[in-house]
Amino acid sequence: MGGRREAIERELKKLRAEREELDGRIRLLESQLEAGPAGFNGAAAGKGVGDDACGGSGACQSRVGNEFAPDGSLPADMIYRYSRHLLLPDFGVEGQRKLSQSSILVVGAGGLGSPLALYLAACGVGRLGIVDGDDVELNNLHRQIIHKEAYVGQSKVKSAADACREINSSIKVVEYHHTLKPCNALEVARKYDIVVDATDNLPTRYMISDCCVLLNKPLVSGAALGLEGQLTVYHHNGSPCYRCLFPTPPPVAACQRCSDSGVLGVVPGVIGCLQALEAIKVATGVGEPLCGRMLLFDALSARIRVVKLRGSSPDCTHCGENSVFTEEDFQKFDYESFTQSPMSDKAAPSVNVLPESARITCREYKKLADDGEPHLLLDVRPAHHFQIASISPSHNIPLSMLEEKLPALEASLKEAGEGSALVVLCRRGNDSQRAVQLLREKGFTSAKDIIGGLQAWGRDVDPDFPVY
């Protein structure tokens, strides 16, 4: 029964997504009819929307996009569509022409890539490439505004490309349904004028920067975490590459990701919009891009600061005067080993620092609790995590406060009864291992952690437990 229900739900999502796409195409044609003769050329151009052909490379490309009159002037439908751009003295016809003839690759269709891709499509970039190997998940939607509920479980790239085509059927949208890696990055990025990094992890940041240096492409790079964001343009007009600023990666403990630390939905939205702006400035030559400067955004105080960066380093191993880094070196380079981090925007990998004798599964703990064995369940997550969801009864002492709270823990353990077991858990089973290490060093020799933490509990014991 469960499998049949899941199949029906998947089919419903698929049909709803198809209906959304058809509704979008209907709205587009209706708006072009309302526009009168100025909109008819656009209607004719949009005839092939959705009739994509996929090649063996994993890229799907839509029909040909913006086309100009023989004398280079903008056609009537483009003048009507982009009239508010054309009225800007600093942008005008020449700016729109350059933008419509440019190609921009967006790496990542998540919180940053969502507004970024939507605005580039709406503003009329000639060819827009979108790279992402993930599927849409429900917990993406608070910040990844390009996706809809109907697309949950489907490819992010398909969802993003469909949304961009609904906004502007006159541009080319190229889909890459895979993660960008050293083995394919050069082939993909080589086809574009500008690359925009909208990813969320350290090894990919190094890889994209190295790729752009080898191909001599400008790189618009943004990041957002928690309530802060930042933005700069690398390897353009004398600006440094990522390695110029960070020749060695920071410690793993200093690298956070939104799946661990959280992010307020609007923050990547702000940075993604600014990334679109910087990409447009680079493509058109209008304004002063953030080359050699970094924009810092603080959402809580609503402050934006721009700080100066040092220039390109002549001693940089990758973009410096004597660099010998080649495309072959790039394709063989192990970015995950270099940064000690996974090439994924998802959760950090599990650690394994305890012997098997110091660990139990969540099912083993469930049996221990059901049998009424005396024990104390210690939850070492931060207090605000504990407020989200917890197993009852459990005591919350955050890992950061554990050592100073050992006397209180010892008293609680005595209250639980003589010979009580001390069982430790956290969100994913990493911090609980570190806690057990500390506890055993301090004399709590019977302490054990629950393998996989609350995520394993929700998966293997209680499917209704809220996983976050």
From Swiss-Prot:
The keyword Ribonucleoprotein does not apply. The active site is at C258, C426. Its EC number is 2.7.7.80, 2.8.1.11. It catalyses: [molybdopterin-synthase sulfur-carrier protein]-C-terminal Gly-Gly + ATP + H(+) = [molybdopterin-synthase sulfur-carrier protein]-C-terminal Gly-Gly-AMP + diphosphate; [molybdopterin-synthase sulfur-carrier protein]-C-terminal Gly-Gly-AMP + S-sulfanyl-L-cysteinyl-[cysteine desulfurase] + AH2 = [molybdopterin-synthase sulfur-carrier protein]-C-terminal-Gly-aminoethanethioate + L-cysteinyl-[cysteine desulfurase] + A + AMP + 2 H(+). ATP binds at G111, D132, N139, N140, L141, H142, R143, K156, D200, N201. One of its GO terms (biological process) is Mo-molybdopterin cofactor biosynthetic process. GO terms for cellular component: cytoplasm; cytosol. Transmembrane segments: none annotated. This is Adenylyltransferase and sulfurtransferase MOCS3-1. It comes from Zea mays (Maize).
